[in-house]
């Protein structure tokens, strides 16, 4: 399945003027544009017949938000949908790679329980049902409990930084997977010169989110 991809565009001074006159108007304009893209993605997913959507993007790109918005759009269009975070499959601090400072490296693929992901994805693609692990970030350990999931004939949206890694997308038949890359597409310029790029924006978003 093809990945949904939107080319970047440079935002010129006209949009700055909108922001200066009414920040609320700019926010609404941005929300409307985003909503149209989400609705478009939902239509493409429904048309693909895939049971599993693999959604990824860089840090602070809006992966989790987009996954839940996509699920809502799918439900509105008549397709049941549920969201699964790849963080659910973390093995735990005792079994995962560490950063140089000793903290858990959540962005390392080896942090995830790949055999269990394979099992769950295959069960979802074949039966629409599986049992998901529950990860406790406070204790950095996997809970003994599990979470049953039933797609009810719908779609599972798997979101995470490794969602498009071939190690994961190759676990189930290609016709059962739809791939989506979520990322910021607007960069801001003055006189054709880029002054705020998507990396700057993501850094600001992550700072606001995690500070």
Where are these regions (language model features)?
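Charged, amphipathic alpha-helical linker segments immediately N-terminal to NTP-binding catalytic cores
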Residues: 1-40
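Hydrophobic anchor at the beta1->P-loop junction of P-loop NTPases
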Residues: 53-55
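Conserved lysine of the Walker
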Residues: 63
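Post-Walker A helix-loop "phosphate-sensing" segment adjacent to the P-loop in P-loop NTPases
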Residues: 72-82
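ATP-dependent NMP and nucleoside kinases share a basic, alpha-helical "lid"
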Residues: 158-207
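Walker A (P-loop) phosphate-binding loop of P-loop NTPases
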Residues: 60
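Conserved nucleotide-sensing/catalytic segment adjacent to the nucleotide-binding pocket
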Residues: 82-84, 91-140, 155
């Amino acid at each position: 399945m093809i990945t949904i991809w939107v080319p970047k565009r440079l935002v010129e001074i006209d949009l700055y003027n909108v922001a200066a006159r009414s920040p609320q108007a700019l926010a609404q304009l941005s929300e409307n544009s985003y909503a149209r893209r989400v609705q478009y993605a939902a239509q493409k997913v429904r048309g693909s017949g895939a049971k599993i959507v693999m959604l990824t993007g860089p840090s602070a790109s809006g992966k989790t938000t987009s996954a839940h918005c996509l699920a809502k759009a799918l439900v509105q269009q008549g397709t049941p949908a549920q969201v699964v975070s790849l963080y659910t499959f973390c093995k735990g601090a005792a079994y995962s790679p560490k950063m140089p400072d000793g903290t858990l490296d959540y962005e390392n693929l080896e942090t995830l329980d790949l055999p269990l992901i394979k099992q769950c994805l295959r069960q979802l693609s074949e039966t629409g049902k599986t049992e998901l692990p529950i990860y406790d970030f406070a204790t950095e350990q996997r809970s003994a409990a599990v979470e049953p999931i039933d797609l009810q004939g719908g779609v599972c949206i798997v979101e995470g930084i490794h969602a498009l890694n071939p190690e994961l997308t190759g676990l189930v038949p290609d016709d059962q997977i739809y791939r989506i890359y979520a990322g910021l597409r607007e960069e801001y310029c003055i006189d054709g010169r880029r002054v705020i790029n998507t990396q700057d924006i993501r850094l600001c978003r992550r700072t606001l989110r995690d500070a």
